[in-house]
From Swiss-Prot:
Keywords: ATP-binding, Cytoplasm, Kinase, Magnesium, Metal-binding, Nucleotide metabolism, Nucleotide-binding, Phosphoprotein, Transferase
Coiled-coil ranges (or none): none
Source domain of life: Archaea
UniProt EC number: 2.7.4.6
CDD domains: NDPk_I
The organism's taxonomic lineage, starting at the top: Archaea, Thermoproteota, Thermoprotei, Desulfurococcales, Desulfurococcaceae
Protein name per UniProt: Nucleoside diphosphate kinase
Secretion signal, residue range per the UniProt entry: none
EC main group: transferase
Organism the protein comes from: Aeropyrum pernix (strain ATCC 700893 / DSM 11879 / JCM 9820 / NBRC 100138 / K1)
Length: 141
């Protein structure tokens, strides 16, 4: 088993609906560790950098508009195979198709307003982490 870190972001719809505690609770109950967490509003510049892999896709503008529409809660989650474990916990991108029991399956009916974002690979985590956090914000415990 490989200990990894991954990024998990509660998007503006999740914050607005009061689901921060639910997301944190699921992470903790799974046995993963939160080693950094903060609430913030992403600037357009940060949002464009964060979603840069989607820059050439038709939904890029809408994605940036949505993620900057309200506060988000970003956290760094650590644990065995954290990237794949968290991806399984959040479910399919489209909340209408996400399995019951997943965060999106339980709380989302949309592909954009789908409560959370999570890194899809260790490489994505490294890129996304640098946009939202600095190493000094990691708390080892």
């Amino acid at each position: 088993m490989a200990v990894q870190r991954t990024l998990l972001v509660v998007k503006p719809d999740g914050v607005e609906r009061g689901l921060i505690g639910e997301v944190v609770s699921r992470v903790e109950r799974k046995g993963l560790k939160i080693v950094a967490m903060k609430m913030m509003r992403l600037t357009r510049e940060k949002a464009e950098e964060f979603y840069s892999v989607h820059r050439d896709k038709p939904f890029f503008g809408e994605l940036v508009e949505f993620i900057t529409s309200g506060p988000v809660v970003a956290m760094v989650v650590e644990g065995d195979e954290a990237v794949s474990v968290v991806r399984l916990m959040i479910g399919s991108t489209d909340g209408r198709k996400a399995a019951p029991g997943t965060i999106r399956g339980d709380f989302s009916l949309d592909i954009m307003k789908n409560i959370v974002h999570a890194s899809d690979s260790p490489e994505s985590f490294e890129r996304e982490f640098r946009v939202l956090f600095s190493e000094s914000e990691i708390v080892e415990w």
